[in-house]
Amino acid sequence: MANIKSKKKRIKTNEKARQRNKAIRSRLHTENRKFRELVAAGDKAGAEAQLRLASREYDKAVTKGTLHRNNAANKKSAMAKLFNSMD
């Protein structure tokens, strides 16, 4: 346990940030999974809507500093590629 007052405060803020980032990453994984399920089911309209929603969530995560912009771009690109491979 830290003895310095500022370090005790940082422990609290770091824990809050960790939980916030964990919630954001969890939401990203959920949206990605929903998208992949729709693609596997062959629902093109649903997959397109889910792709837009997931892309928006990735952009929000970048804005909040949870993900690096290149990481989000890579994930969005992979999802778009999967969507475009649907017949």
Curated annotation (Swiss-Prot):
For this chain, one GO molecular function annotation is: small ribosomal subunit rRNA binding
UniProt cross-references to InterPro entries, sorted A to Z: Ribosomal_bS20, Ribosomal_bS20_sf
One Pfam family here: Ribosomal_S20p
Task: Give the transmembrane region(s).
Answer: none
Q: What superkingdom does the record give?
A: Bacteria
Chain segments carrying region Disordered: 1-25
Q: Which SUPFAM superfamilies match?
A: Ribosomal protein S20 (SSF46992)
Q: Where is the composition biased (Basic residues)?
A: 1-11
* Cellular component GO terms, alphabetical: cytosol; small ribosomal subunit
Q: Which is a GO BP term held by this UniProt record?
A: translation
Q: Cell membrane: present as a keyword of the record?
A: no
Keyword annotations for this protein, in alphabetical order, are: Ribonucleoprotein, Ribosomal protein, RNA-binding, rRNA-binding
PANTHER family documented for this protein: 30S RIBOSOMAL PROTEIN S20 (PTHR33398), SMALL RIBOSOMAL SUBUNIT PROTEIN BS20C (PTHR33398:SF1)
Write out the similarity annotation: Belongs to the bacterial ribosomal protein bS20 family.
Function, as annotated: Binds directly to 16S ribosomal RNA.
Q: What is this protein called?
A: Small ribosomal subunit protein bS20
